[in-house]
Protein backbone atom coordinates (compact mmCIF):
# COMPACT_ATOMS: atom_id res chain seq x y z
CA UNK A 1 0.00 0.00 0.00
CA UNK A 2 2.76 2.39 0.91
CA UNK A 3 4.47 1.71 -2.42
CA UNK A 4 1.23 2.42 -4.38
CA UNK A 5 0.74 5.63 -2.43
CA UNK A 6 4.29 6.70 -3.19
CA UNK A 7 3.73 6.03 -6.89
CA UNK A 8 0.52 8.08 -6.87
CA UNK A 9 2.23 10.98 -5.10
CA UNK A 10 5.12 10.84 -7.56
CA UNK A 11 2.69 10.91 -10.52
CA UNK A 12 0.86 13.87 -9.03
CA UNK A 13 4.12 15.73 -8.52
CA UNK A 14 5.07 15.12 -12.14
CA UNK A 15 1.68 16.43 -13.30
CA UNK A 16 1.99 19.51 -11.09
CA UNK A 17 5.50 20.14 -12.39
CA UNK A 18 4.37 19.81 -16.02
CA UNK A 19 1.41 22.12 -15.37
CA UNK A 20 3.70 24.69 -13.75
CA UNK A 21 6.15 24.53 -16.66
CA UNK A 22 3.32 24.81 -19.21
CA UNK A 23 1.79 27.74 -17.31
CA UNK A 24 5.16 29.52 -17.14
CA UNK A 25 5.77 28.93 -20.84
CA UNK A 26 2.30 30.20 -21.75
CA UNK A 27 2.72 33.28 -19.56
CA UNK A 28 6.13 33.97 -21.07
CA UNK A 29 4.73 33.55 -24.57
CA UNK A 30 1.90 35.99 -23.85
CA UNK A 31 4.26 38.56 -22.34
CA UNK A 32 6.68 38.20 -25.26
CA UNK A 33 3.88 38.58 -27.79
CA UNK A 34 2.60 41.66 -25.95
CA UNK A 35 6.08 43.20 -25.91
CA UNK A 36 6.59 42.48 -29.62
CA UNK A 37 3.17 43.91 -30.45
CA UNK A 38 3.89 47.11 -28.52
CA UNK A 39 7.26 47.48 -30.20
CA UNK A 40 6.42 46.65 -33.81
CA UNK A 41 2.64 46.58 -34.36
CA UNK A 42 1.08 49.06 -31.95
CA UNK A 43 -0.53 51.97 -33.77
CA UNK A 44 0.16 55.49 -32.54
CA UNK A 45 -2.78 57.83 -33.04
CA UNK A 46 -1.29 60.81 -31.21
CA UNK A 47 2.22 62.23 -31.15
CA UNK A 48 2.29 61.92 -27.36
CA UNK A 49 1.97 58.13 -27.70
CA UNK A 50 5.35 57.81 -29.42
CA UNK A 51 7.74 56.47 -26.75
CA UNK A 52 10.86 58.49 -25.97
CA UNK A 53 12.94 55.42 -26.83
CA UNK A 54 11.76 55.68 -30.46
CA UNK A 55 13.11 59.20 -31.01
CA UNK A 56 16.30 59.36 -33.11
CA UNK A 57 16.35 55.56 -33.36
CA UNK A 58 13.21 54.04 -34.86
CA UNK A 59 11.41 54.60 -38.14
CA UNK A 60 7.61 54.70 -38.30
CA UNK A 61 5.61 53.76 -41.39
CA UNK A 62 2.33 55.33 -42.44
CA UNK A 63 0.09 56.98 -45.00
CA UNK A 64 -0.06 60.73 -45.58
CA UNK A 65 -3.71 61.75 -45.30
CA UNK A 66 -3.47 65.54 -45.50
CA UNK A 67 -0.98 68.35 -46.09
CA UNK A 68 -1.93 71.60 -44.40
CA UNK A 69 1.14 73.74 -45.02
CA UNK A 70 4.40 73.83 -46.91
CA UNK A 71 6.39 72.01 -44.25
CA UNK A 72 3.96 69.82 -42.29
CA UNK A 73 1.41 67.06 -42.82
CA UNK A 74 -0.67 64.40 -41.07
CA UNK A 75 0.37 60.75 -41.01
CA UNK A 76 -1.88 57.74 -40.38
CA UNK A 77 0.44 55.27 -38.67
CA UNK A 78 0.35 51.76 -40.18
CA UNK A 79 2.94 49.77 -38.19
CA UNK A 80 4.21 46.67 -39.94
CA UNK A 81 2.65 47.56 -43.28
CA UNK A 82 1.15 44.55 -45.07
CA UNK A 83 2.81 42.17 -42.61
CA UNK A 84 1.12 44.10 -39.82
CA UNK A 85 -2.28 43.35 -41.33
CA UNK A 86 -2.85 46.65 -43.13
CA UNK A 87 -4.86 46.17 -46.28
CA UNK A 88 -6.35 42.81 -45.32
CA UNK A 89 -6.92 42.66 -41.53
CA UNK A 90 -6.72 46.35 -40.71
CA UNK A 91 -7.75 49.18 -43.01
CA UNK A 92 -6.01 52.48 -43.72
CA UNK A 93 -8.18 55.47 -44.69
CA UNK A 94 -8.92 55.91 -48.38
CA UNK A 95 -8.66 59.30 -50.05
CA UNK A 96 -10.88 60.67 -52.80
CA UNK A 97 -9.17 61.28 -56.11
CA UNK A 98 -8.92 64.73 -57.62
CA UNK A 99 -10.14 65.08 -61.21
CA UNK A 100 -7.27 66.82 -62.96
CA UNK A 101 -7.77 68.41 -66.34
CA UNK A 102 -6.59 66.32 -69.27
CA UNK A 103 -5.24 69.36 -71.10
CA UNK A 104 -2.76 70.05 -68.28
CA UNK A 105 -1.52 66.46 -68.38
CA UNK A 106 -1.10 66.55 -72.15
CA UNK A 107 0.72 69.83 -71.94
CA UNK A 108 3.22 68.39 -69.51
CA UNK A 109 3.55 65.24 -71.58
CA UNK A 110 4.29 66.79 -74.97
CA UNK A 111 5.88 70.08 -73.99
CA UNK A 112 8.63 69.55 -71.43
CA UNK A 113 9.49 72.37 -69.11
CA UNK A 114 12.77 73.21 -70.78
CA UNK A 115 10.91 73.75 -74.10
CA UNK A 116 8.00 75.72 -72.66
CA UNK A 117 10.40 78.03 -70.76
CA UNK A 118 8.12 78.10 -67.78
CA UNK A 119 8.85 80.49 -64.99
CA UNK A 120 9.88 78.94 -61.71
CA UNK A 121 6.48 79.40 -60.12
CA UNK A 122 4.66 77.85 -63.07
CA UNK A 123 6.70 74.67 -62.69
CA UNK A 124 5.08 73.98 -59.36
CA UNK A 125 1.64 75.39 -60.15
CA UNK A 126 1.29 72.86 -62.97
CA UNK A 127 1.81 69.86 -60.70
CA UNK A 128 -1.18 67.59 -60.17
CA UNK A 129 -2.37 66.87 -56.65
CA UNK A 130 -3.76 63.31 -56.96
CA UNK A 131 -5.94 63.10 -53.84
CA UNK A 132 -8.05 65.23 -51.56
CA UNK A 133 -6.84 65.40 -47.99
CA UNK A 134 -8.88 64.03 -45.10
CA UNK A 135 -9.09 65.63 -41.69
CA UNK A 136 -10.52 64.41 -38.38
CA UNK A 137 -8.59 61.14 -38.49
CA UNK A 138 -6.44 59.61 -35.71
CA UNK A 139 -3.18 60.86 -37.20
CA UNK A 140 0.25 62.11 -36.17
CA UNK A 141 1.04 65.77 -36.86
CA UNK A 142 4.45 65.84 -38.55
CA UNK A 143 6.78 68.82 -39.03
CA UNK A 144 9.56 68.35 -41.60
CA UNK A 145 13.00 68.59 -40.06
CA UNK A 146 15.74 70.94 -41.19
CA UNK A 147 13.69 73.30 -43.36
CA UNK A 148 11.39 76.29 -43.37
CA UNK A 149 8.90 76.74 -46.21
CA UNK A 150 7.66 80.23 -47.19
CA UNK A 151 4.83 81.39 -44.95
CA UNK A 152 1.27 81.39 -46.24
CA UNK A 153 -1.23 84.13 -45.42
CA UNK A 154 -2.11 84.07 -41.72
CA UNK A 155 -3.94 86.47 -39.41
CA UNK A 156 -4.18 89.20 -42.04
CA UNK A 157 -0.51 88.97 -43.04
CA UNK A 158 0.32 88.60 -46.72
CA UNK A 159 1.65 85.30 -48.03
CA UNK A 160 5.30 84.98 -48.97
CA UNK A 161 6.27 84.29 -52.59
CA UNK A 162 6.42 80.56 -53.34
CA UNK A 163 4.34 79.64 -50.29
CA UNK A 164 1.56 78.26 -52.48
CA UNK A 165 4.06 76.50 -54.74
CA UNK A 166 5.67 74.79 -51.74
CA UNK A 167 2.25 73.58 -50.60
CA UNK A 168 1.36 72.29 -54.07
CA UNK A 169 4.68 70.45 -54.36
CA UNK A 170 4.30 68.82 -50.95
CA UNK A 171 0.74 67.72 -51.69
CA UNK A 172 1.77 66.44 -55.12
CA UNK A 173 4.70 64.53 -53.61
CA UNK A 174 3.21 63.10 -50.42
CA UNK A 175 -0.56 63.02 -50.17
CA UNK A 176 -1.93 59.49 -50.42
CA UNK A 177 1.54 57.92 -50.28
CA UNK A 178 3.13 55.67 -47.68
CA UNK A 179 6.28 57.11 -46.14
CA UNK A 180 8.80 56.44 -43.40
CA UNK A 181 9.42 58.98 -40.65
CA UNK A 182 12.21 59.13 -38.09
CA UNK A 183 11.01 61.05 -35.01
CA UNK A 184 13.61 63.55 -33.80
CA UNK A 185 11.83 65.80 -31.29
CA UNK A 186 8.60 67.62 -30.44
CA UNK A 187 8.18 71.30 -31.30
CA UNK A 188 6.40 74.04 -29.35
CA UNK A 189 3.13 73.24 -31.14
CA UNK A 190 3.15 69.58 -30.12
CA UNK A 191 4.12 68.33 -33.58
CA UNK A 192 6.63 65.58 -34.20
CA UNK A 193 9.70 67.00 -35.94
CA UNK A 194 10.89 64.18 -38.18
CA UNK A 195 13.05 63.15 -41.09
CA UNK A 196 10.70 61.90 -43.81
CA UNK A 197 11.64 59.51 -46.61
CA UNK A 198 9.78 57.78 -49.42
CA UNK A 199 10.75 55.39 -52.19
CA UNK A 200 10.75 56.50 -55.82
CA UNK A 201 11.93 54.84 -59.01
CA UNK A 202 15.28 56.64 -58.57
CA UNK A 203 15.72 55.49 -54.96
CA UNK A 204 15.02 56.85 -51.50
CA UNK A 205 14.15 60.54 -51.23
CA UNK A 206 14.51 62.81 -48.20
CA UNK A 207 11.50 65.15 -48.43
CA UNK A 208 13.17 68.05 -46.63
CA UNK A 209 16.26 67.82 -48.81
CA UNK A 210 14.18 67.64 -52.00
CA UNK A 211 12.43 70.87 -51.04
CA UNK A 212 15.78 72.59 -50.52
CA UNK A 213 17.05 71.29 -53.87
CA UNK A 214 13.95 72.63 -55.63
CA UNK A 215 14.22 76.02 -53.97
CA UNK A 216 10.85 75.85 -52.21
CA UNK A 217 12.28 75.78 -48.69
CA UNK A 218 15.32 77.18 -46.92
CA UNK A 219 17.55 75.58 -44.34
CA UNK A 220 16.02 76.11 -40.90
CA UNK A 221 17.46 79.24 -39.32
CA UNK A 222 16.20 78.98 -35.75
CA UNK A 223 18.83 78.85 -33.04
CA UNK A 224 16.72 76.52 -30.91
CA UNK A 225 14.77 73.46 -31.95
CA UNK A 226 16.72 72.93 -35.18
CA UNK A 227 16.80 69.26 -36.20
CA UNK A 228 18.92 67.92 -39.05
CA UNK A 229 19.69 64.36 -37.89
CA UNK A 230 23.41 65.22 -38.17
CA UNK A 231 23.06 66.26 -41.83
CA UNK A 232 23.08 70.05 -41.63
CA UNK A 233 26.14 70.35 -43.90
CA UNK A 234 24.29 68.43 -46.63
CA UNK A 235 21.34 70.81 -46.39
CA UNK A 236 23.63 73.86 -46.55
CA UNK A 237 25.42 72.49 -49.62
CA UNK A 238 22.22 71.87 -51.59
CA UNK A 239 20.83 75.26 -50.60
CA UNK A 240 23.95 76.90 -52.00
CA UNK A 241 23.50 74.96 -55.26
CA UNK A 242 19.82 75.96 -55.51
CA UNK A 243 20.72 79.59 -54.82
CA UNK A 244 23.47 79.56 -57.45
CA UNK A 245 21.15 78.05 -60.07
CA UNK A 246 18.31 80.41 -59.05
CA UNK A 247 15.81 77.66 -58.45
CA UNK A 248 12.41 78.36 -56.97
CA UNK A 249 12.39 81.22 -54.48
CA UNK A 250 16.04 81.98 -55.30
CA UNK A 251 14.87 83.19 -58.72
CA UNK A 252 13.47 86.28 -56.99
CA UNK A 253 15.55 89.45 -56.93
CA UNK A 254 14.60 90.06 -53.31
CA UNK A 255 13.55 87.39 -50.88
CA UNK A 256 12.82 87.50 -47.17
CA UNK A 257 13.48 84.20 -45.43
CA UNK A 258 10.59 82.64 -43.49
CA UNK A 259 12.52 83.18 -40.26
CA UNK A 260 12.94 86.92 -40.88
CA UNK A 261 9.34 87.16 -42.07
CA UNK A 262 8.05 85.65 -38.81
CA UNK A 263 10.21 88.01 -36.77
CA UNK A 264 8.91 91.01 -38.70
CA UNK A 265 5.20 90.19 -38.45
CA UNK A 266 5.53 88.96 -34.87
From Swiss-Prot:
Its EC number is 3.1.-.-. One of its GO terms (molecular function) is metal ion binding. Gene3D superfamilies: 2.40.50.90. Pfam families: SNase. The chain crosses the membrane at residues 15-37. Keywords: Calcium, Endonuclease, Hydrolase, Membrane, Metal-binding, Mitochondrion, Nuclease, Transmembrane, Transmembrane helix. Ca(2+) binds at residue 148. Its main location: mitochondrion. The keyword Hydrolase applies. GO terms for cellular component: membrane; mitochondrion. The active site is at 143, 151, 191. The keyword Manganese does not apply. Residues 58-252 form the TNase-like domain. It is an enzyme of class 3 (hydrolase). It is a single-pass membrane protein. It is found in: Mitochondrion; Membrane. PANTHER family: EBNA2 BINDING PROTEIN P100, SERINE_THREONINE-PROTEIN KINASE 31. Belongs to the LCL3 family. This is Probable endonuclease LCL3. It comes from Lachancea thermotolerans (strain ATCC 56472 / CBS 6340 / NRRL Y-8284) (Yeast). The gene is LCL3.
Amino acid sequence: MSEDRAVRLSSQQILYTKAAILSAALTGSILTSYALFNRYLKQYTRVTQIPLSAFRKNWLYGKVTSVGDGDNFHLFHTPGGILGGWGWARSAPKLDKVNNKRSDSLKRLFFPRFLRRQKEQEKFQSLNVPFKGRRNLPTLSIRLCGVDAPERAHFGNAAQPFSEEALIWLRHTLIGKFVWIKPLSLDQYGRCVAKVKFWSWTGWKNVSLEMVKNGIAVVYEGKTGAEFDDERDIYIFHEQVARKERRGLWSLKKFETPGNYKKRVG
